[in-house]
UniProtKB/Swiss-Prot annotation:
Disulfide bonds join 35-47, 40-54, 57-77, 61-73. It comes from Drosophila melanogaster. This is Tumor necrosis factor receptor superfamily member grnd. Residues 1-27 form the signal peptide. It comes from the Eukaryota. The gene is grnd.
Length: 241
């Protein structure tokens, strides 16, 4: 099969070829030529009759050198002339493929991140997931229970009567105020001693106190409290004219 009869296979998207014309190179590699015991490269070399050795095609096909020979290039290096223009195209295709691969990788990463974000939003809003998280938290951090077995950290208390019921320790005694003999004069008394009959709380053995008929008092008699029974009534007070 001749190299010239091979047609290049190509696939393009938007005018950019993705599969280079490699069928020509593959066919040429199968037609290696023997040059007096030496195998020449099927594309880049030819058997030069003058030297009986493999000679590079670039020397006779490059018009910028003094060894340029158009007839010899067309006869012996036809595969080289066909393949050489494709090198730049193949290089562009490789660069394009690398760029496409990079863009696809970035796109897949963005899609994966978006899917993960949507899944987390759905998972947080799911009631089953919230119940599962509450159970895990209750197992990891158990709340201390009260003496009667009720959990005060719970959202509800099942037995409200456990806090306030008849006969419980939480019941408070009612405050009581009793009237005594001095209440008529406007004195409010407590459970023990009327306000009007309270006396200084000094020790009677100190030198600053003097024993009196009431029991004890100050050295200054004007500071001694007069008992209620000895207070003069309104009838005995003389009226000044």
């Amino acid at each position: 099969m001749s190299v010239r009869k091979l047609s290049a296979l190509s696939l393009s998207i938007g005018g950019v070829p993705l599969i280079p014309s490699v069928s020509l190179v593959a066919a040429a590699n199968g037609e290696s030529r023997d040059c007096h015991g030496t195998i020449c490269h099927p594309v880049n070399e030819f058997c030069y009759v003058a030297t009986e050795r493999c000679h590079p095609c670039i020397e006779v096909c490059n018009n910028q050198t003094h060894n340029y020979d158009a007839f010899l290039c067309a006869k012996e290096c036809s595969a080289y002339k066909t393949f050489e223009p494709l090198k730049a195209e193949m290089l562009d295709i490789q660069n394009t493929q690398q760029l496409i691969l990079l863009l696809l990788t970035i796109l897949l990463v963005l899609i994966a991140l978006r899917c993960a974000f949507q899944f987390l939003r759905w998972l947080i809003g799911n009631r089953c997931f919230q119940k599962l998280m509450r159970r895990l938290q209750s197992k990891a951090y158990p709340h201390p229970a009260t003496a009667n077995g009720k959990d005060l950290n719970a959202t509800t208390i099942q037995n409200l009567n456990a806090i306030n019921h008849p006969g419980s320790d939480l019941e408070r005694a009612q405050s009581q105020i009793y009237s005594v003999a001095g209440a008529a004069e406007g004195s409010v008394v407590t459970m023990t001693t009327p306000v009007s009959t309270r006396y200084p709380a000094e020790n009677s053995t100190t030198p600053t106190t003097v024993m009196t008929e009431i029991g004890y008092g100050y050295d200054n008699q004007a500071m001694v409290v007069t008992p209620v029974s000895e207070k003069p009534s309104a009838a005995t007070i003389p009226v000044a004219f």
